[in-house]
């Protein structure tokens, strides 16, 4: 059986921390920002953690 491939799009979007958690950037912070409040844009700048319910799917895409 051949090696399983890593999802290259996922590699560009997620980073695994030393403790095994997966970091991701927030969505909705690329364009059409004028109608979004400063408070909302400030919150969207922060790095988020992948939700426990999504961990398995993301881990399989990363194949670490």
UniProtKB/Swiss-Prot annotation:
SUPFAM superfamilies: L35p-like
Pfam families for this protein: Ribosomal_L35p (PF01632)
Ribosomal protein as UniProt keyword: yes
GO molecular function: structural constituent of ribosome
InterPro entries found in the cross-reference section: Ribosomal_bL35, Ribosomal_bL35-like, Ribosomal_bL35_CS, Ribosomal_bL35_sf
A GO cellular component entry from the record: cytosolic large ribosomal subunit
Record key words, sorted: Ribonucleoprotein, Ribosomal protein
Ranges in a coiled coil: none
One Gene Ontology term from the biological process aspect of the record: translation
Domain of life: Bacteria
HAMAP family: Ribosomal_bL35
Family under the similarity heading: Belongs to the bacterial ribosomal protein bL35 family.
Protein name per its UniProtKB record: Large ribosomal subunit protein bL35
Gene this chain is encoded by: rpmI
């Amino acid at each position: 059986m051949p090696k399983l491939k890593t999802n290259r799009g996922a590699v560009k979007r997620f980073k695994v921390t030393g403790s095994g958690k997966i970091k991701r950037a927030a969505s909705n912070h690329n364009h059409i920002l004028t109608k979004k409040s400063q408070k909302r844009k400030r919150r969207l700048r922060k790095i988020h953690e992948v939700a426990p319910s999504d961990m398995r799917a993301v881990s399989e895409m990363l194949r670490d």
